[in-house]
């Protein structure tokens, strides 16, 4: 029973998890009270406190990466009911047998234990004797066991993972307290901060967080040291890597990793011939995007999931229709006992001997063998442009119509802006333009794998305004805002210094608002930072709003840098624009898109110092201006804002990039390819996401051009230039 409680909670909230609004698995009232400090701090006070000193986690010499899987108890019986969720637990294997089998079959080099106290200490000791590394998740230990265990294991111990412990606490009467995003973050971070400190004080070592939520940056800001996104329920694995890698660089963390919940959340049926191929692809993707620890959550030692429509689990007896049934002795007597003998005859469908579990182990074993032949690349991949995750962006990495930000459904009844809306849609806008998801699993949908035709990017978190212009300039040529942001004078100073220092900033009116209560549909000049005086950042002041404008177009009959020409319309827009008073010299400005009636600017290039701002001049979030059904619109168009993001991403290219045969732009084949370049290793990695067709690209590295043809699903490694520390475009 130890392993199923979290899974039941996660299963019921699968869709919401992908929107980062789900209840965390162990985040009940008891846990909240235990984690709530007596004297709470503000989030600013928390981030101002010195962080625990850490070093980069050393990687194994043999593979240079930790490849592992979860260790669960197998006690036999029905663990929960539900006509879609019935989950049976087989009897094979016992803990010790599993540890031994992992070492014998070389199913990776790491085990993630779910056990507690002396059992945990004994199993990790056994794993160490067999040459394996250990970590744990949700584990508890008393009487100094944790410290004694970690000191004994030394480098064989990787840290404690508190899993999906946290969510935003709207169980309190927030409405009468005047709910703000700031208040939610303060309460959230206080609980994380206290728990992380307790784990450190108990001697657990590095603290990890595994979660599908998009608020992982606030857990890191509160003291967590190793972010491990729960990949697959998170959604886009490439975007998840950008978040983990960005936090790794920003907070100088020991490492970042991935928790592959493939069995639960890959969601495609076994009848799809590429069901298991996607697990192999996930391992390759994480390897080539910089993860140094990859844990396969389940599937290889026994099956758990009921979220695959034709999983062998669906062939087990189903007697209890409601998942909400309290699973106690009476329930077992009623629902389990009558069919237990029948179920036992089918344990071979779901235990480690089953064909599906064997496939999982074979894929992990083969990937570990690959890593021993091709050790994971040193350092992190080059990522020279970033997506900004704005301050107080708590909604999620995409739009879910029925989801409320922070689960604030009560607040949303009075203020519908607490429901997902244009800020969350704007994440979809930027992702679809520069991180497309090809239909690689047809007829099933691909919701997990995005290509990188414009190269890898990081996510730069503005959580708590805890970021500096120095960090941004050392790492990113281009910084693009899309989703929610609450601006402040401190943040405005960072943005000004970034642009003056040479950065390219893509930002809009909405992102410079100081609103912290989701009142974004009622924008005013008074809510803008500096009262709308953006002279230092952009060279103009915002005086107010123009009348609504309905169509955008190019300013000239000659195509500009975005490819826009006059009379090719983008829209409908239906948006008021910023009424601007220009302060800087006229030559500092270039109008890139204007309205088709009076030529009021939609998008303006504002040159400033060594850098520039690509300014979105409408009173709403970017997605509001990306509808594209106007004169000249084509099927493959990505919208006005989409083209802006693509142009900016090209400005952010590093030493290595791919294009089509025009040598300038990614073509359709590039939209099926993930690539990365590791300057410390001197290698380029390319992965064709198309399982059925060759895909071609021009690999451009350090001025050279190579025409490549990747076979279906090919993962290719190419020698490149190894850079010295002062030559790299990212500061490690």
Please report, for each region that a protein language model flagged, where it lies by residue.
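Mature N-terminal, pre-catalytic/accessory segment of carbohydrate-active enzymes
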Residues: 18-20, 24-125, 133, 148-162, ...
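Aromatic-Pro/Gly-enriched surface loop or interdomain linker
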Residues: 50-58, 65-75, 81, 328-475
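Helical hinge/lid and interdomain linker segments adjacent to catalytic or ligand-binding clefts
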Residues: 92-103, 114-121, 125-128, 425-524, ...
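Substrate-binding cleft/loops of secretory-pathway carbohydrate-active enzymes
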Residues: 145, 149-152, 198-243, 265-274
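Active-site clefts of carbohydrate-active enzymes
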Residues: 224, 245-276, 302-305, 346
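Carbohydrate-binding surface patches
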Residues: 380-420, 474, 496, 600-632, ...
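A glycine-rich, often tryptophan-bearing local segment used as a flexible ligand/cofactor-contacting loop or short
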Residues: 485-570
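Catalytic beta-strand/loop cores that center a nucleophilic Ser/Cys/Thr
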Residues: 514, 546-609, 621-626, 652-701
